[in-house]
């Protein structure tokens, strides 16, 4: 993978992460989730941290792991009926 392709993948994941965070935030608001220890709030924090790791990633494998976290959060939201 070229450096250009790697940068494009980072950009795509930044957008995907922003979308997941927005969906999780909406879910939290709609369900009046405020406590930081609620599983959805913890999932939000995990996704937030994963999004922050995108630009410091050095390999495609790291980006694949981050994308997997985003996919898990999306699957949760889908099963919860939010998407």
Language model segments and positions:
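Short amphipathic alpha-helical interaction elements located at domain edges
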Residues: 2-6, 10, 36-39, 76-83
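Alpha-helical and His/Cys-centered functional microenvironments
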Residues: 14, 56, 73
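Amphipathic alpha-helical binding modules
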Residues: 62-83
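N-terminal acidic leader/helix
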Residues: 2-33
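Acidic, low-complexity, intrinsically disordered interaction modules
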Residues: 26-65
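A general marker of short, structured functional hotspots
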Residues: 2, 23, 40, 66, ...
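Amphipathic, well-ordered alpha-helical segments in soluble domains
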Residues: 16-23, 46-49, 69
């Amino acid at each position: 993978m070229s450096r250009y392709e790697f940068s494009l993948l980072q950009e795509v994941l930044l957008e995907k992460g922003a979308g997941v965070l927005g969906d999780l935030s909406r879910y939290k608001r709609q369900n009046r989730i405020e406590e930081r220890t609620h599983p959805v709030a913890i999932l939000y924090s995990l996704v937030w941290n994963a999004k922050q790791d995108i630009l410091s990633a050095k390999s495609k494998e790291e980006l694949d792991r981050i994308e997997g976290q985003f996919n898990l959060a999306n699957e949760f939201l889908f099963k919860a009926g939010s998407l």
